[in-house]
């Protein structure tokens, strides 16, 4: 018995394999975090002129960390150095996103921040020179809103960095 080769059969199998592969890739679901919708929130960060004074009272820049959190318990109980660590393992289960920025004394920085729709809190950590005397941690609870309210929201997140304190509010 002889094998008869059908012209184009190899090409046909290759096309079929590509088609199967594409259909399988198309059915793969992304992890929930990767698919989560983002909510844009107008944000304004203002730094006082006397921000983060040194021993001589001269103002200096400060690094601000902004955490999007699903829960706030671990964040509230963590020390400064645990939160400032880029891995922040102590809050890993609650942390949806971490943003780091440096602000200069007297700077006002408007931005449109994108927040994970599962975020319930924004945690702030300011790296002041004098961590012992500073109010380096701030927390703001995000409003729980439905889809339409998110779309038409006019809320604004205000973050204020005073000489040795960080505070936040939603207006």
Feature-to-residue mapping (PLM):
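Short amphipathic, basic-aromatic surface patches that mediate peripheral association
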Residues: 44-55
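Tryptophan-paired
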Residues: 78-115
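Bacterial N-terminal signal peptides that target proteins for export
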Residues: 3-18
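Bacterial N-terminal signal peptides
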Residues: 17-27
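Short acidic/polar inter-strand loop motif in beta-rich domains
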Residues: 129-136
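A short, solvent-exposed beta-strand micro-motif common in secreted/extracellular proteins
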Residues: 119-129
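Short coil-to-beta strand junction motifs in C2/discoidin
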Residues: 56-65
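Glycine-rich, aromatic-bearing surface loops/beta-hairpins
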Residues: 137-171
């Amino acid at each position: 018995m002889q094998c008869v080769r059908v012209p184009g059969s190899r090409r046909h199998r290759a096309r079929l394999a590509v088609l199967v592969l594409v259909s399988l890739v198309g059915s793969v679901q992304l992890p929930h975090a990767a698919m989560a919708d983002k909510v844009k929130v107008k944000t304004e960060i203002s730094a006082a002129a006397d921000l983060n004074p040194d021993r001589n009272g001269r103002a200096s820049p400060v690094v601000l960390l902004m955490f999007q959190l699903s829960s706030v318990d671990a964040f509230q109980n963590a020390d400064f150095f645990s939160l400032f660590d880029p891995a922040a393992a102590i809050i890993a289960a609650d942390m949806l996103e971490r943003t780091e920025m440096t602000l200069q004394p007297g700077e006002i920085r408007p931005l449109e921040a994108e927040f994970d729709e599962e975020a319930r809190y924004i945690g702030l950590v300011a790296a002041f020179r004098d961590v012992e005397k500073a109010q380096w941690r701030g927390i703001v609870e995000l409003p729980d809103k439905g889809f339409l309210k998110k779309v038409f929201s006019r809320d604004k997140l205000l973050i204020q960095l005073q000489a040795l304190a960080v505070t936040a509010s939603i207006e």
